[in-house]
Amino acid sequence: MLKVILKKEIDSEKFLQEIKKRLIEDKGYKGLIIDGEGDFTYRAADDYEGACYFSYASWLSHRKTEQTENGDVLYFGIIPSKKKRLTKEVYSFFHTHFSRFLLSCFDHHIKDIVISADINQEIDIILNPQKRIGD
């Protein structure tokens, strides 16, 4: 999971809208889903450019936003296309490439990005959705 800490003056909702726009318009992602609470999930594109960010993982998910006095904190994760593809390599690939995407496009909005240290815990959360943050 990626924990993205925004600069204090950055509005998290506007930031999420910018990410949506950039992923859909510039990266060719498709299948935008917005759930009842405003979270969103993207289906990765079939082309190389879209797929390169996620390898075998097919979905990017914004899981939660926390508002703190030092700036909003957003949590991102992935939902693999097949549970057998839940490997440390897939998560490492996601962390590396999605972090690069965020920093290359939105460095001026971001204070810090923290990568989940416990990949096994993240895999457990995906396999057991009731353990997700915010649930």
Across the structure, where does each feature detected by a protein language model lie?
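Ampiphathic alpha-helical segments that act as solvent-exposed interaction surfaces
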Residues: 19, 80-114
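Compact, well-ordered interaction domains used in eukaryotic information-processing assemblies
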Residues: 46-61
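A structural detector for beta-sheet-dominated domains
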Residues: 5-9, 43-45, 79, 104, ...
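Short, low-complexity, polar/charged sequence segments that are solvent-exposed and flexible
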Residues: 23-27, 61, 94-99
